[in-house]
Amino acid sequence: MLREGARLGWALRPNSPKLKNFLNTFLQDNREGTLFGNIIRNRYIRDFDWAENAAGAEELTRYRALSALFRKYGTDYGMDPTLLAAQGFQESRLDQSVRSHVGAVGVMQLLPSTAEDKNVGIPNIDELAPNIEAGAKYMAFLKARYFSGPELEGINGSLLALASYNAGPGRIRRLRREAGERGYDPNQWFDNVEVIVAEQVGRETVQYVSNIFKYYLTYRWINSADAERAAARRATGIEDAP
């Protein structure tokens, strides 16, 4: 149990005793008051509005309607489809009709000039599928060009690419170097490079990446719940409609 009276819970199938025991042990070892437990509480649990925003009925319908496109283009360009979907939610609430005051277009809020750049080269971003493809390809370009290498383990290369999508790759590369010079880990976004970015750029980019990561966690929970539900239906001989 993370806390009593919470608005968000974690449901398990009753025939998953190993998973239940693992989670109970993890929560006991990382309860509030421990270092990791406090980090988790302060970053993700204290305020659940972000999860409710991404997991509302209308938002879930939109997410599920676009999931196949994010899977396709995430796979095509070597990016995590769930992270791309979370980015799309942050940019536009997954709404292709959105246009910004500076001319950014659609789900991924790309400028036409970015989509036309030789490193992207995807036309027709007024249409849904090309818009998501262009966003995925641009993210893949940022990550491969500026934030790849064995030192960037796990999701950190993608988080730095997200920061660059918002604030520009040249600026984030410079601030990453400054983070290393000032004793922070230049290969870790959270609590390291983000500190320097907040100081030098302001909270907008830090909040942008933080929001996307929270939506990413929400979508991962949704994906897991959907997979569990589908498995249970198959086990009982109930097939989902095509």
For the regions a language model picked out, list residue spans one by one:
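Alpha-helical scaffolds flanking conserved acidic
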Residues: 80-86, 105, 155-163
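Sec-exported extracytoplasmic/periplasmic mature domains
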Residues: 24, 28-32, 45, 49, ...
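Catalytic and substrate-binding regions of cell-wall glycan-acting enzymes that process beta-1,4-linked
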Residues: 2-12, 18-22, 156-225
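Substrate-binding/active-site groove segments that recognize
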Residues: 97-123, 130-141, 186-188, 212
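Export/targeting segments at the very N-terminus of extracytoplasmic proteins
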Residues: 45-94, 129-132, 146-150
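Second-shell loop/turn segments in exported
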Residues: 8-13, 53-60, 71-73, 95-98, ...
